[in-house]
Regions:
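Positively charged, small/polar-rich N-terminal and surface patches that mediate targeting and assembly
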Residues: 1-112
Length: 112
């Protein structure tokens, strides 16, 4: 099993979520995040004063999938999240040794 983690632009979340649901992905975890990569934040003007925003708002999306679905799900996320601009985000996978559905006690792929 794999945990797929994606850091995305917030306005792309609905598009990514819809694309994943169209591929049969039935569960995901979404949380707010902030950070920076190559774009290094940005400068804004508020009431005539210029200030630098070091941490850019992002969304962290996590999806747990069977190994055989990992590459396909990553491709779906990348395609739906891409704008072609700096700051589109990152997607990575992490091996998962065990998953347990708390309600039923199911383990492994049956618990996804």
């Amino acid at each position: 099993m794999k945990l797929i983690t994606a850091i995305l632009k917030p306005f792309k979340l609905d598009e990514v979520k819809d694309a994943l649901q169209a591929e049969g992905i039935t569960g995901m975890t979404v949380s707010e995040a902030s950070g920076f990569g190559r774009q290094r934040g940005h400068t804004e003007v508020y009431r005539g004063a210029e200030y630098t925003v070091d941490l850019v708002p992002k969304v962290r999306l996590e999806v747990l999938v069977d190994d055989k679905d990992s590459d396909r799900v990553v491709d779906v996320i990348v395609k739906a999240a891409s704008t072609g601009s700096i700051g589109d985000g990152k997607v990575w996978t992490t091996p998962v040794d065990q998953v347990v559905r708390v309600r039923t006690g199911e383990r492994g792929p049956d618990a996804i």
